[in-house]
Regions:
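Generic protein-terminus/edge-of-domain signal
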Residues: 1-61, 65-68
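Conserved hydrophobic/aromatic beta-strand scaffold that supports enzyme active sites
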Residues: 29, 50, 74-76, 98-100
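Residues immediately flanking
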Residues: 55, 79, 101-103
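Short acidic-glycine-tyrosine-enriched beta hairpin
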Residues: 64-78
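Histidine-centered metal-chelating micro-motifs
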Residues: 75, 80-86, 106-107
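A hydrophobic/aromatic-rich effector-binding and dimerization subdomain
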Residues: 88-153
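Hydrophobic/aromatic residues within well-ordered alpha-helical segments
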Residues: 135, 165-166
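All-alpha amphipathic helical-bundle segments outside canonical DNA-binding/catalytic cores
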Residues: 152-165
């Protein structure tokens, strides 16, 4: 991890840093192929972050390890964790997705009550979830459903619907 870690405390701040529009203050789906990550590669997120890497021959550093994501890999970070998103050329990924969601989004939902049971959020820094092509397709479909819900006006059902997709 480099000396200059960008601390991102909110979903809105994350959107601003990555050149995305904020559609909901507590959740965002960010397409890394459209993100502007030229000025930073090391991040500390103040919210849950799920990173789906679709890049070939790129690596991320999480903890003290680098990961080679040749087929598709999922990293799940809890609020306060850091990640270095760069490959061997010190450039950021060009393909993948970030699902960023604040703990307040899942408060009072089944996901909020059970998130500690999802062990992939408590993996050691040298662990990650490698996903099959079919698993990646399912994840992308769910991200698309979240994005579709975000395109609608926020209402009393948004939180429950989005948390079910997560």
């Amino acid at each position: 991890m480099g000396d200059k870690v960008l601390k991102i405390g909110s979903v809105h701040q994350c959107n601003c840093c990555m050149g995305s529009k904020t559609l909901h203050p507590l959740v965002s789906v960010i397409d890394l192929s459209k993100a502007d990550l030229s000025s930073h590669t090391d991040f500390k997120f103040g919210f849950y972050t799920i990173l789906l890497s679709e890049c070939k021959c790129e690596a991320y550093r999480y903890g003290h390890q680098y990961y080679d994501f040749s087929d598709g890999t999922l990293l799940c970070l809890t609020p306060g964790e850091s990640i270095s998103m760069k490959d061997s050329d010190n450039t950021c990924p060009s393909k993948g997705w970030i699902l960023a969601f604040h703990p307040d989004l899942i408060c009072g939902t089944a996901l909020g009550a059970n998130i500690r049971d999802y062990t992939f959020f408590s993996y050691r820094p040298e662990e990650a979830l490698h996903v099959s092509l079919r698993e990646k397709q399912v994840i992308l479909e769910l991200l698309d459903k979240i994005n579709q819900e975000l395109q609608r006006c926020i209402d009393c059902y948004s939180q429950k619907i989005i948390s079910k997709y997560i």
